[in-house]
């Protein structure tokens, strides 16, 4: 399987094991398979049997083997078996699917170690990184940015692993107390939390700036686990497959997905699954007040907001005004025209955005690629949480409420079951839950102690050079071997 950059018109091929540890391509683009594997009826039938008889980890090995041909299949099976286990995940199904109400289902992605859907990819990445580093006798320094859940998922997946340090940037004061406690309370000598004076997009910009410095990246062995890393999307494709299987009984049945998203990572995996031939009807983008993606799918205008115009909302993991994975979809939408994508994302996005409203390709977003969208407000979230709790006796977090609210908007127009992809357990967003139902969510027993742990975090200015120096100093003063 060859991989190409979204900005490389020459389509220089790369191998999976090389892009696994790197993140961004050298030209600043994002990696995608040169061609998507194609599924047929026999493959889908086989996967139904694998999930039923062998479980999620075995299905994951089947899916991932389509994208990875430079790791032996038996090793892939061992890696997925370690990544997706019970009781590491709180359900033997790993990703259960339950019916919420008429034609709307919940895909439970928050059964993992940090109660967030990011665990689905991060647990696999932890195993893959350690495997590949050991194979190469190398070390890596993972640099990432998080608006909430990515950081804790990455840190719990990478802690204690041979050859790995983690440097995670967070927007100072913009995460919930539970999210801060999960990250900052983690006691591991090779986990480094950095609270940056800015919003999430500032953190993401610093990560991209550091990664774009080829010399610094090489000298300090910088890698990435944010959703720009292809392996994360690859891992997420698996639960689209498993959720489709659990919701249907025959291969000609389609489903739709309503996906809360800010960074376009989770739903990009759905796009890839659909391109492979998984029977998906609609991919519904659910945003909060930071609705840059909803605006694009309604109008064709991709208008990046400034930090000052990025709203602080009650679904904070989606408080993103520049969707870093969106480039992958636009690459496909524009017929894989890397020269044009390079102009759009290398130049025009830096100047505030671009418009495809008058481009004939824009109509394909809905007609050919199945996308739809909607937005949710704080009032919508609170009302949805309260309604789902009082009528259905189910408690959902604010981001999942965004997904349910938007799914309900589309239910009458979509003739398939809609699976809302859960993003986190309610305990991570207690203030909003209290506002919605009048009481705090119960803290699962496995998380009871984290709120009392002392914090380990460094405050830094919104400055790339300051972050670089911090990384250099930390590497010099710690060992991962």
Swiss-Prot record:
Which keywords annotate this record?
Amino-acid biosynthesis, Lyase, Pyridoxal phosphate, Threonine biosynthesis
Keyword rRNA processing attributed: no
Pathway where this protein functions: Amino-acid biosynthesis; L-threonine biosynthesis; L-threonine from L-aspartate: step 5/5
Top-level enzyme category: lyase
Q: Which reaction does it catalyse?
A: O-phospho-L-homoserine + H2O = L-threonine + phosphate
Which Gene Ontology BP annotations are present?
threonine biosynthetic process
Where is the PTM N6-(pyridoxal phosphate)lysine found along the chain?
A: 118
Q: Which Pfam families match?
A: PALP, Thr_synth_N
- Offer an example of a GO molecular function term for this protein: pyridoxal phosphate binding
The set of disulfide-linked cysteines is none
Q: Which cofactor does it need?
A: pyridoxal 5'-phosphate
Bilayer-spanning residue ranges: none
Q: Tell me which EC number(s) this protein carries.
A: 4.2.3.1
The job of this chain, per UniProt, is described as:
Catalyzes the gamma-elimination of phosphate from L-phosphohomoserine and the beta-addition of water to produce L-threonine.
Tell me which PANTHER family the record gives: THREONINE SYNTHASE FAMILY MEMBER (PTHR42690), THREONINE SYNTHASE-LIKE 2 (PTHR42690:SF1)
Q: What family does the Swiss-Prot or TrEMBL record give for this protein?
A: Belongs to the threonine synthase family.
Under the subunit heading, UniProt states: Monomer.
**Protein name (database record):** Threonine synthase
Quote the gene name from the UniProt entry: thrC
């Amino acid at each position: 399987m060859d991989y190409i950059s979204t900005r490389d018109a020459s389509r220089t091929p790369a191998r999976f094991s090389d892009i696994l540890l790197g993140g961004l391509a050298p030209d600043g683009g994002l990696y995608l398979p040169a061609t998507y594997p194609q599924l047929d009826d026999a493959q889908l039938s086989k996967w139904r049997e694998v999930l039923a008889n062998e479980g999620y980890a075995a299905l994951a090995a089947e899916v991932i083997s389509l994208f990875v041909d430079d790791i032996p299949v038996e090793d892939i099976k061992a890696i997925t078996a370690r990544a997706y286990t019970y009781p590491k995940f709180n359900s033997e199904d790993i990703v259960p699917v339950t019916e919420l109400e008429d034609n709307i289902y919940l895909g439970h992605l928050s059964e993992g170690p940090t109660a967030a859907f990011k665990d689905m990819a991060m647990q696999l990445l932890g195993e893959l990184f350690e495997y590949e580093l050991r194979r190469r006798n190398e070390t890596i320094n993972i640099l990432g940015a998080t608006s909430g859940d990515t950081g804790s998922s990455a840190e719990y997946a990478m802690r204690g692993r041979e050859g790995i340090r983690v440097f995670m940037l967070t927007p100072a004061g913009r995460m919930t107390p539970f999210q801060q406690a999960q990250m900052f309370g983690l006691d591991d000598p090779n986990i480094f939390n950095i609270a940056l004076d800015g919003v999430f997009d500032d953190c993401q910009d610093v990560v991209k700036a550091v990664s774009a410095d080829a010399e610094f990246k090489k000298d300090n062995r910088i890698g990435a686990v944010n959703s720009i890393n292809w392996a994360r999307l690859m891992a997420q494709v698996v639960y689209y497959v498993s959720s489709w299987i659990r919701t249907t009984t025959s291969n000609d049945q389609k489903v739709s997905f309503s996906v809360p998203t800010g960074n376009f990572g989770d739903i990009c995996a759905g796009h890839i699954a659909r391109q492979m031939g998984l029977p998906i009807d609609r991919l519904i983008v659910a945003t909060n007040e930071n609705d840059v993606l909803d605006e694009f799918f309604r109008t064709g205008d991709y208008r990046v907001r400034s930090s000052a115009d990025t709203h602080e909302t009650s679904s904070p993991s989606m408080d993103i005004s520049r969707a870093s994975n969106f480039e992958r979809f636009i690459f496909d939408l524009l017929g894989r025209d890397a020269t044009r994508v390079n102009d759009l994302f290398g130049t025009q996005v830096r100047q505030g955005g671009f418009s495809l409203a008058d481009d004939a390709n824009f109509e394909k977003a809905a007609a050919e690629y199945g996308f739809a969208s909607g937005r949710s407000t704080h009032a919508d979230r609170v009302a949805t949480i309260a309604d789902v709790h009082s009528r259905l006796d189910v408690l959902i977090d604010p981001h999942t409420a965004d997904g349910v609210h938007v799914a309900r908007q589309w239910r009458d127009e979509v003739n398939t079951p809609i699976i809302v992809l859960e993003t986190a357990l309610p305990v991570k967003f207690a203030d909003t839950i209290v506002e919605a139902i009048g009481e705090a969510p119960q803290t699962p027993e496995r998380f009871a102690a984290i709120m009392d742990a002392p914090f380990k975090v460094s405050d830094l200015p919104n400055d790339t050079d300051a972050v670089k120096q911090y990384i250099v100093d930390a590497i010099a003063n710690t060992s991962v071997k």
